[in-house]
């Protein structure tokens, strides 16, 4: 933890950042906001929110297909011989293995049918690294640590668990479990390999149990020794539970009691986000303590975590892109970070830090913001010929997922 802000959220989103394509969200309590009330009374006009593309529909589709092909190939090239998907690549030296980051890489790789085998190999790595109650420093079964891999000649020579102040480390339990469940559901759906899922049913149960164990009231806490309830984490938890619900109904239909628990938890976290995090001033609280105390003062001018966390409501599926509230949140975000000014123009990849923030373009793609997404993607494609720092696997994964969303939307328009 860094100064009270989740490293995963800060680094994950930024180094890249949740809500994986393929994790569908079915909860809908109203036609406008998927169960979220207190929306602004006057919705902003569409012209105030979305920008038109400069390229033709066909040119946009071509651009996004190139990005999907290029990013999936690069992400696949990162994979180590033991199946791990490191944040970056080096033939020799030390590489960070962050399972949460790796999940976004895997989700992106599943946009191509070329890499099903490699995603399966990554899932094998993840399953083999699940902690037991004895090996987890919080005594919780089904979690997974961050690791460092030492490689030589492109081969893994050793893996060691990362530590923080002398303790073995994972940044969270809730998000790590949720995003991995998204990977498994998407792998099963895209590849059709239900047999692999069934073979690993016991371990999937463990991951699901770890996720459910993080609930305190209507929301999840980051991990047992860091009891903060983050908007971003809980959006990802909603996605993960929606994915788990679909996965279990497809591959483990006989586990009716567990399916019922998953469905109830999905509804609980959706309601909890609305009941406990929505502020009538027009935003969701970034984080609270289990007693309801606000843990981080909100300001739209604070790019991370305040402003970016609002977009997770869109990318997670908790808000429909056409809903009044999604449009208002997206407009407020762009009022602050699509200004045309340096360090506050995300579509020009000009932001307060040096990272690519794939989570932002992913939310923009879901909103159907053709103009801003096109601007971002053209710059990204030009900058990423060598996939050099500060690009990380999860950021590239998010960009790829955004491109895939745009291909689908533009194809439907045809």
Name these PLM-found stretches.
Residues 93-211, 231-234, 373, 377, ...:
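Aromatic-rich carbohydrate-recognition surfaces in CAZymes
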Residues 18-36:
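Sec-dependent signal peptide cleavage junction
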Residues 35, 39-104, 111-157, 205, ...:
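Low-complexity, Ser/Thr/Pro/Gly-enriched N-terminal "stalk/linker" regions
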Residues 62-72, 80, 84-88, 93-100, ...:
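Extended ligand-binding clefts on enzyme/binding-domain cores
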Residues 12, 16-17:
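Hydrophobic core
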Residues 46-61, 101-116, 169, 178-196, ...:
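Well-ordered alpha-helical scaffold segments within catalytic/enzyme domains
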Residues 1-9:
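Bacterial N-terminal signal peptides that target proteins for export
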Residues 66, 98-104, 108, 112-117, ...:
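Active-site core of glycosidic bond-cleaving carbohydrate-active enzymes
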């Amino acid at each position: 933890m860094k100064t009270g802000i989740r490293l995963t959220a800060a680094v994950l989103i930024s180094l890249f950042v949740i809500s994986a394509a393929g994790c569908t969200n079915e909860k809908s309590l109203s036609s406008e906001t998927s169960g979220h009330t207190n929306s602004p009374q006057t919705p902003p006009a569409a012209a105030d929110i979305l920008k038109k593309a400069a390229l033709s529909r066909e040119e946009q589709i071509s651009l996004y297909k190139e990005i999907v092909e290029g990013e999936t190939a690069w992400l696949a090239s990162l994979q180590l011989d033991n199946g791990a998907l490191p944040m970056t690549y080096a033939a020799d030296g030390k590489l960070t293995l962050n399972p949460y980051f790796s999940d976004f890489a895997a989700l992106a790789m599943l946009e191509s049918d070329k890499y099903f085998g490699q995603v399966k190999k990554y899932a094998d790595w993840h399953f083999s690294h699940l902690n037991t109650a004895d090996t987890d420093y919080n005594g919780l079964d089904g979690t997974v640590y961050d690791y460092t891999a030492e490689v030589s000649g492109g081969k893994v020579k050793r893996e060691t668990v990362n530590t923080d102040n002398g303790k073995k480390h994972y940044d969270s339990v809730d998000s790590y479990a949720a995003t991995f469940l998204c990977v498994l559901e998407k792998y099963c759906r895209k590849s059709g390999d239900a047999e692999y899922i069934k073979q690993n049913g016991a371990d999937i149960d463990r991951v699901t149990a770890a996720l459910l164990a993080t609930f305190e009231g209507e929301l999840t806490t980051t991990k047992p020794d860091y009891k903060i309830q983050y908007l971003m984490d809980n959006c990802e938890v909603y996605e993960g539970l929606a994915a788990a619900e679909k996965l279990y109904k497809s591959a483990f239909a006989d586990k009716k009691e567990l399916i019922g628990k998953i469905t109830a938890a999905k509804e609980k976290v959706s309601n909890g986000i609305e009941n406990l995090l929505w502020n009538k001033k027009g935003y969701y609280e970034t984080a609270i303590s289990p007693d309801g105390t606000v843990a981080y003062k909100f300001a739209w001018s604070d790019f991370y975590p305040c402003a970016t966390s609002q977009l997770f409501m869109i990318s997670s599926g908790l808000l429909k892109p056409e809903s009044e509230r999604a449009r208002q949140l997206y407009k407020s975000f762009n009022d602050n970070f699509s200004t045309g000014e340096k360090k506050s123009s995300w579509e020009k990849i000009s932001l307060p830090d040096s990272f690519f923030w794939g989570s932002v373009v992913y939310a923009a793609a879901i909103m159907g913001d053709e103009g801003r997404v096109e601007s971002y993607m053209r710059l990204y494609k030009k900058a990423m010929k060598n996939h050099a720092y500060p690009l990380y696997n999860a950021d590239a994964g998010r960009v790829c997922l955004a491109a895939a969303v745009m291909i689908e939307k533009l194809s439907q328009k045809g």
